[in-house]
Swiss-Prot record:
Keyword set includes Metal-binding: yes
EC number, as in UniProt: 5.3.1.14
Keyword presence, Metal-binding: yes
The reaction(s) this protein catalyses: L-rhamnopyranose = L-rhamnulose
Name of the protein: L-rhamnose isomerase
Self-association and partners: Homotetramer.
Family matches, as Pfam families: RhaA (PF06134)
InterPro entries: L-rhamnose_isomerase, Rhamnose_isomerase, Xyl_isomerase-like_sf
HAMAP family membership: RhaA
Highest rank taxon of the organism: Bacteria
Record keywords: Cytoplasm, Isomerase, Manganese, Metal-binding, Rhamnose metabolism
Cofactor: Mn(2+)
Lineage: Bacteria, Pseudomonadati, Pseudomonadota, Gammaproteobacteria, Enterobacterales
Amino acid sequence: MTTQLEQAWEIAKQRYAAVGVDVEEALRQLDRLPVSMHCWQGDDVAGFENPAGSLTGGIQATGNYPGKARNAEELRADLEQALSLIPGPKRLNLHAIYLESDAPVARNEIKPEHFKNWVTWAKANKLGLDFNPSCFSHPLSADGFTLSHANDEIRQFWIDHCKASRRVSAYFGEQLGTPSVMNIWVPDGMKDITVDRFAPRQRLLNALDEVISEKLDPAHHIDAVESKLFGIGAESYTVGSNEFYMGYATSRQTALCLDAGHFHPTEVISDKISAAMLYIPRLLLHVSRPVRWDSDHVVLLDDETQAIASEIIRHNLFDRVHIGLDFFDASINRIAAWVIGTRNMKKALLRALLEPTAQLRQLENDGDYTARLALLEEQKSLPWQAIWEMYCQRHDTPAGSQWLDSVRAYENAVLSQRG
């Protein structure tokens, strides 16, 4: 540890102590908050089932930066590089299309054995795993419908895929000793004016009920459902709307997933957290950055990311909110994208933990909104960066932009060889 860092740390501790904040306790709390990194940033959501296939489901990865992972070994190596540059606890979020098998496997026939390499790797890297059925980029999703499909056989195929995915998720939780959160998102919707909006939602409701009918140990597996406003090719109607899934999660007591990019551009999920928590047991967050639409840009340390983190901390939702990331930018170095986005999420959590919330809440209860605003703004100038740098130091990760040197070295030695 450098003398300069030690001095900055001591000064920062004193500054925060003056406003009633224990920085050591803040760092202890930060170590209770894993962030689930999404594997699909590493290969532009291609997966290993059919890497040459096109991405469908109304989502899009734009850009053609060289060096993307082409197989599981490369993806895991890239993830290890990213993980080494991010301090504190992490998890990995997998999609079903990232299975490994010597022979083709139908999606309704995936099994835990197809993900055993991921579990072995997760154990070695001390990671929890989360999971997602992949209801897109498949011939039976080509017309834009899956769990709400009017064709009984096609709908049953996707039901069986989600059932099989739940068993994989439970396998993760059982093997790793931490529950896997399995999120169900389907792209179902219509491009233009829709006459019957009711029937597809009724089918989706019934399909989801069948999917979650098998009782699984909550210590191993947690069900979550995710809404969306629209997707490319489904601009006019989305079966799984916010109202649909809020009702479903409330009535079935599943977790609800809020994705930062899945709402109208003027809506923010930070304002939805406290409302949802009144009705549902758990919340899954997909922190992202929508630019005009659900563009899935890399997460910044911006106002909304900070507001999301503050909601979690202010209301002590450590054990009820699961923090995941969801972005995929193919225009920049993919490892750097992981590092930037995940570090920013952790920075936002740290800044929230360094807030004198009790004091601010008292001012609010007293009706002293002048002091509330003044202190909220003044705390932005407190030396949180020194606390972050100490946190990085304790976790043997670079504190500042030095991490980029490691990414560039890896790019030159490894990524550049992939063509």
